[in-house]
C-alpha cells in the first residue's frame, strides 16, 4: 500500500465540530463494497440491514442511505448480482427506527416522478418526517437495456436535463400537491399527490461531473462525492471546492458528504494486513465488467462517478476513499476530513458492517474531535 501523505495539524472550529455528520451506506447488494473473494461473502437481507441501521442509530449515526442496483458485475463473487429494492427496504427500516434519517435511491429512468413523490410521502408518514430521496440518472446501460427502457446513448449527454424536469415535478407535487409541468421529458396534466410530506423533503445527489455539480447546486440539499486514495483523507478537497464554487453561483448552501470505507483494527499493522488480504483476492472478472461499463459513456466528461469507480488504483472497493489503520488512526483521519472546507459529513462503509459499526461507535467515534458534541450512549443493547 502506498504510504500516506504527511498528516496535517489543525484545530477544528466550533462550527466544524457541529457540522460533521456520519452516515452508513447500507449493503443493499451482496458483499457490500468489496469486490474480493477474500472479503466477507453474504446476501442482502432485511434482517441484516435492520441490525446495521439499528446499531448505527444506537451509536448516533445521523443517516442511513441505500443505493439501487438493477444488475450486478458477475464474476466469482457474483458481485451485486443480488440486490434488494431501495424504497421498500428503507420503508421497512423507517418502521423499526426512531431517530436516524433515512434515504432511499430512485433510479429515475425506472420510476415516474409522480410515483416517487407518492412513495416518498408514504415513507415520510412511516418515519415521522425522517425520509429523503437520492436521485440518480443511471450510468450502467445493461441495467436498463434488460428491461427495454434504455433511451439511447444520447441520454448520457442529456441525463441532467432529464433530471432537472424530474425534480421540478417532484417539487410541485411535494409543495402544492399538484403539477401541470410541461417539458421535453414529462407532461403533467393536473397531476395530484396527497397527502404531502410533513416536512420539506430532502433531495440528495452524487454528481461529480460539471453537469452533476451544477444540478446539485440548484436542486440538492447536499451532494455526495468519493473520497480519494488510501489514508489520504483530505485528497477529495478539490472536489469539495468545486461543489462549493458551484453552490456559490446559485446562492445556495450545498455541502459535500464524502464516501469512505473504514478498515480498522487494534493496530495499524493489523488493519493493513486485512486490506492487503482483500486486495489479493480481487475478483478480476467482476472488475473487468465494471471497467467495460465505465467506457460506455463518452459524453459526460472525465470526472464521472463510474470512471472513478473503475480506476485500477483501488478498484477492489470501487475506489472510494479508504481509511486503514488503528482505531485512533482512523479517528484522526476522520477529523482531518472534517477540516476540509465544504465537507459537512461522511458516508461510511465497512469491510464487516456489524462489527465495523460497533467498533466505530465504541472505539473510533469517542476519539473524534468533530463528534465531541454527542450525548453519552444509553445502556440499551445495540
Swiss-Prot record:
InterPro entries: Luciferase-like_dom, Luciferase-like_sf, Pyrimidine_monooxygenase_RutA, SsuD_RutA_monooxygenase. Disulfide bonds: none annotated. It catalyses: uracil + FMNH2 + NADH + O2 = (Z)-3-ureidoacrylate + FMN + NAD(+) + H2O + H(+); thymine + FMNH2 + NADH + O2 = (Z)-2-methylureidoacrylate + FMN + NAD(+) + H2O + H(+). Keywords: Flavoprotein, FMN, Monooxygenase, NADP, Oxidoreductase. GO terms for molecular function: alkanesulfonate monooxygenase activity; uracil oxygenase activity. CDD domains: Alkanesulfonate_monoxygenase. It comes from the Bacteria. It holds the Pfam family Bac_luciferase. Induction: Up-regulated by the nitrogen regulatory protein C (NtrC also called GlnG) and repressed by RutR. The keyword Flavoprotein applies. One of its GO terms (biological process) is uracil catabolic process. Its EC number is 1.14.99.46. FMN binds at residues 68-69, 134, 143, 159-160, 209. It is an enzyme of class 1 (oxidoreductase). The keyword Acetylation does not apply. PANTHER family: ALKANESULFONATE MONOOXYGENASE (PTHR42847), ALKANESULFONATE MONOOXYGENASE-RELATED (PTHR42847:SF4). The FMN-N(5)-oxide reacts spontaneously with NADH to produce FMN. Requires the flavin reductase RutF to regenerate FMN in vivo. NCBIfam families: RutA. Belongs to the NtaA/SnaA/DszA monooxygenase family. RutA subfamily. This is Pyrimidine monooxygenase RutA. It comes from Escherichia coli O1:K1 / APEC. The gene is rutA.
